[in-house]
């Protein structure tokens, strides 16, 4: 065998060995951090929110005045921070016109925002926390419908 061929065979064998070892490791149960008396029982986290008291106060009734109004629903999960997240649900399939009637020639669609939440761990490590992405509906908007012409 040439040096190049020998190197490729060794690389292949090394790769297979790594894959097998990683599958054996991943099949085992994850280990939790051991309890330690010097580890604090609670941790204080300071959240610094910029522009908290800005003068750009928004009207709180956008959900009623919109041409695509929505209702807010409480999403509560005690194992998550924040534990309460308010989510929007579009009231109509169509949009509200200037007369206050629903116009089904337009579509009311949700506006979604991805946020980060902290989730409390469960078995086998109940005292752990993990950061998760969550898709939240924050409002609704009015759009023109997608029309497919059949020829």
Swiss-Prot record:
Residues carrying a glycan: 36, 53, 64
Cysteine-cysteine disulfides: 90-140, 95-142
GO molecular function, one term: cytokine activity
This protein's GO CC annotations: extracellular space
Keyword Disulfide bond: yes
Entry-linked Pfam families: IL17 (PF06083)
Claim: Secreted is one of the keywords in the record: yes
Superkingdom, taxonomy of origin: Viruses
Keywords: Cytokine, Disulfide bond, Early protein, Glycoprotein, Secreted, Signal
Family to which this protein belongs: Belongs to the IL-17 family.
The protein, known as: Viral interleukin-17
């Amino acid at each position: 065998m040439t040096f190049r061929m020998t190197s490729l065979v060794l690389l292949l064998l090394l790769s297979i060995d790594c894959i097998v070892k990683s599958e054996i490791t991943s099949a085992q149960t994850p280990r939790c951090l051991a309890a330690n008396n010097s580890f604090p029982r609670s941790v204080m986290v300071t959240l610094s929110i910029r522009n908290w008291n800005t003068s750009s106060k928004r009207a709180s009734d956008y959900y009623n005045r919109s041409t695509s109004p929505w209702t807010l629903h409480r999403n509560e999960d005690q194992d998550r921070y924040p534990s309460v997240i308010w989510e929007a649900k579009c009231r109509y399939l169509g949009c509200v016109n200037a007369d206050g009637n629903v116009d089904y020639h337009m579509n009311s669609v949700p506006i979604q925002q991805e946020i980060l939440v902290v989730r409390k761990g469960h078995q086998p490590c109940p005292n752990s926390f993990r950061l998760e992405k969550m898709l939240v509906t924050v409002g609704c908007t009015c759009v023109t419908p997608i029309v497919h012409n059949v020829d």
